[in-house]
Design a protein with these regions (language model features):
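Non-catalytic RNA-recognition surface used by pseudouridine synthases
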Residues: 1-129
């Protein structure tokens, strides 16, 4: 009952500020190989305050966007099931960051581990400025 329509100008202002937001995601992912706590530790160390480059293709044009990953933690849930907590800049395409998006996101979790990682669930836990 407390919902109201958003004006287009308000939506445009919010989208323009998306880079300023810090978003915390919880990602449940399935890996191609079994994953260990050492893999999680190496990801945690590698992705602390790391820039991630994303490429977007629109016809012949290729756009490049740089985003920050501030923190990456995780825990092994099963043999090939892992849960990641990722704190990053608001404009990061999180699914592409996890699976690599066919080389369009570099570095990615799958590229760093050296095997396929497929996100199953993505939840937003927190959004802050």
């Amino acid at each position: 009952d407390n919902l109201s329509r958003a004006r287009a100008s308000a939506v445009d202002r919010m989208k323009a500020r998306i880079r300023d937001y810090v978003i915390t995601y919880r990602v449940l992912a399935i890996t191609a190989n079994s994953i260990t706590d050492e893999n999680i530790k190496s990801l945690h160390d590698y992705f602390r305050n790391r820039q991630v480059v994303q490429l977007f293709r629109r016809g012949r044009r290729v756009r490049r966007r740089v985003s920050m990953v501030y923190e990456l933690d995780g825990r092994v849930v099963g043999d090939r099931l892992v849960e990641f907590l990722i704190k990053c800049q608001g404009n990061l395409y999180i699914r592409g960051f996890v699976h690599g998006s066919y080389g369009n996101v570099e570095p990615s979790i799958a590229g760093t581990l050296g095997f396929s990682v497929r996100p199953v669930e993505v939840d937003i836990l927190n959004i802050s400025d």
